[in-house]
Amino acid sequence: MNEEDLNRLNASGDLNGANNQRIPAGPSGVNQPIPSVTAGGQNQFRPSGGLGNQGSRPTESSNQDELLPTEAEIEAITSDVESNSVAPKATIREILDTLQAKRQNATPKDLFSLAWACYHNGSSRFVNLNTDAPCGITHADLKTLWKASATLRQFCSYYAKSCYVSGKQQKKPPANWSRKGYPEEAKFAGFDFFNAVLSESSPAPPGGMRFKPTQAEILGHSMNAKMSIVESRQSSHMVSTRADLLGRQQINEQPKPPMITF
């Protein structure tokens, strides 16, 4: 078909010409491309629409590393958060069972009373506690019931949020905050297991987290913790610490002026 025949066909409006018929669907049921005639008499095929025979994309499962768990397994494992600085709930339950074996009237408030005493006096294993739990046992005896399962600080860290919120709510900062060098705006962070307040492993108190740690409290506790580490090293490694201080002094010492000769 030449250009003159094509123009005549378009002018007549005949849409049933041989070159305008749709090719029947193929075996797959997908309409075949429709041929269109150009001015030069050449056939050009245009797609009939739809996705047609596009190649199927590979599924994500085919690309999954065989050494990785499934998505459901990852969600199951990461649903619980445990930190080795905070005693897990199972350990706290064992401690309560041990206490109740000695004191039948013991309740969870006795365990919290020990954490509250350490809130004011420290949770070091060397701390001296002269107070008593509500059930009648002394805190000094209570803190020795579970030496093998958790440290005193790990135990107290479980109650860190409860101690922090109670202290702020009752306006009772740790008793030794000033002696430890905390500023006024950070005094409620002046207990040595404050960092557990920011841990997901420490449960929130029954009334929820009514108070959140401020930036000043977080910074104040961080600086105090670093100073405690320095003091601990000074007391146990006096020789090496003194050498470090001398080395720093030599580094910071101003250089001697050059000698001028004539």
From Swiss-Prot:
Chief location of this protein within or outside the cell: virion
Alphabetized UniProt keyword annotations: Capsid protein, Helical capsid protein, Ribonucleoprotein, Virion
GO cellular component: helical viral capsid; ribonucleoprotein complex
Residue numbers spanned by region Disordered: 1-67
Highest taxon listed in the record's lineage: Viruses
PROSITE patterns for this protein: POTEX_CARLAVIRUS_COAT
A GO molecular-function descriptor: structural molecule activity
Biased composition (Polar residues): 29-46, 54-65
Entry keyword Ribonucleoprotein: yes
Keyword Ribonucleoprotein: yes
UniProt protein name: Capsid protein
Organism, as annotated: Shallot virus X (ShVX)
